[in-house]
Amino acid sequence: MATKAPNDLNKLFYGDNLDVLRNSIADESVDLVYLDPPFNSNRNYSLLFKEKSGDQSQAQLEAFDDTWTWSHESETAYVEILKSAAPNQVKDALEAMRKLLGDNDVLAYLVMMTQRLLELHRVLNATGALYLHCDPTASHYLKIVLDAIFGGDNFRNEIIWQRTGSKGYQTRRLPNNHDVILGYQKSPASKWQLDAAFLAYDLNNLDPKTAGKYSQRDPDGRRYSLTDLTGPNDPRPNLTYEVMGVTRRWRWSRERMDEAIAQSLVIQPKPGGVPRYKRYLDDQRGKPLGDVWTDIAPLNSQAAERLGYPTQKPLKLLERLIALTTEEGDVVLDPFCGCGTTVDAAQRLGRKWIGIDITTLSVDLTDARLRHTYGEQIRDTYEMLGIPRD
């Protein structure tokens, strides 16, 4: 268990994230964990790490080879969890899945993930949250593990991100065009930024319902709706008074009403009619964000931010998650940081960050990305730890 005190520098670690978490990340020192681990879906990206000489680091190869097999190392890790101080429900869940699945690649993947998720839970603040990005081949198993570690009551959302359009005709099933992001809070005190949970209206492309509700326009084109100003059955006498020749029980005090009238926000639709409030569309928070995200496009080969990294996610996706769950100055941790999208998003939003990856290629790519985006001076704001140098 790490007890080192954090400093003000961001950190980019080269190494096995399990070792880094255990030895270098203190308890309750992180506000948000986002992880996009290798999916157990038989995809192989290991060729990415071949050097021009043809040599490969075995650690790098195994780190990004998206196929997991049950081995002596898997058995050792499984026994370690059962003998550890992990909650009994975690041990029960793993034992049950071993009975269900047998000693196969799926179980090996789940054991590897359980070790790391236990450590990630430890390093999270009580006000923190974790979001795990996966695909449907493993999401149902991972949710069992997360429920056991965080508690089912701390499950927040299963976010569906549509990462591609239809992949064409499938003979015996529908094509898979989405990823899953499982969100958990550390406790009911975990942060949630409500203002970030709305999508700004596209005033040039409104859905029919919103366009119908805000159908009226000012001469300058601003859309608005007229809403009721009369109040509920509130007995307070100061809410009953005359406005524009009409006496009613109103929602607001006289002072607030006069202020709105002075701002031309209260109008009388017709002579003698009940005054109403002008609610402008562009003053509203926006459309509430749901748990199916279709508005963030995947990166295609022409995308300006694309780095050629096979599992690179859009910057906008990470910016949204960070904005929803953290405040400026909070610490964001990505234990599978890949090409550095999470740390880039955290940097843009004024958060501190920790990135970990087991491949030198990923760590060097993240370093280069940050320096290219923010200038060489950014290098003074973070440490690179564990990098082997000649």
Descriptions of predicted regions:
Residues 381-390:
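Post-kinase regulatory C-tail/linker adjacent to protein kinase catalytic domains
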Residues 1-367, 372-376:
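Core catalytic lobe of class I
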